[in-house]
Amino acid sequence: MAELQQTDRDVRAHEQAHLLAGRGVVTSGPDYTYTYGPDGKRYATGGEVGIDTSPEHKPEDNIDKGVRIQAAALAPKDPSAQDYQVARVGVKLETQGRQDLSQQQ
């Protein structure tokens, strides 16, 4: 049961980190997956926070949003594979914004 309690704390801290760093890009959550322990209590064993990765209309906004997506995705001390995947979307959005901005100048 101590392992479930630790997992619950870790999962909640992980998702909270996404929320705190995700100003303006977090769309939902945290949503948790629960497991019942031998004591009959629910323990969070997984979770997710929705992050808006859709492009904006202006290059400057895409740069800003891409940076914020990366910050939100990589905020936990132990990013998951999904977190790294979302961060890559942020990198692409930021890069595209920078390319579009340089073409306008």
Task: Map each language-model feature to its residues.
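Type III/flagellar secretion export determinants
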Residues: M1-Q105
